[in-house]
Amino acid sequence: DVYVETRTVIGPKAKKPLVLDIPIMAGGMAFGLGLSEHVKVAIAKGTAKVGTCTNSGEGPLLPEERAAAKYYILQYSAGTWSKETETLRQADAIEIRLGQGAIAGVGGVIPGENVHGRLAELLNVPEGKQVIIPSKHEELPRSKDLKRLADRFRSVTGGVPIGIKLAPSAWLEADLDLAIR
């Protein structure tokens, strides 16, 4: 038998690196937009048992999911939810969502018929109200504002790792250069 080190460190230079037991993470899948509360909590419990993290996805922070997770990545979306300092401080890492897959710079809509119960409560909107997810972050009018936002997150969280989720263009290196400035 050969020993294989599976421990994975996200943000090794962060004040509070995220140290996972295995190099596998649950991807971002949102409560109420894609998954039910029961599924989100089950994924959080499963990731906790194997020593890895779960990800909020584009939806709001679900307190029951956070309580069940050992490690939690908060996806910071262009929506109006999960932006409070108290919410940010619950994250073991923050992923700034700029795009994904083939939908860079595209917003979204949560139909009113899907906005009820717990989802309406956590989004802080009336039941039945359609929710628009903007195509871009209001606080990021220019690429140089990304550093300011990341610095704010580092400050309020005590230094958790900050990453981005993007759908790169045909000029990947240029996209990455803008992201790391």
PLM regions and their residue ranges:
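N-terminal capping/small domains of soluble enzymes
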Residues: 1-134, 145
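Glycine-rich phosphate/ribose-binding loops and adjacent secondary-structure elements
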Residues: 137-181
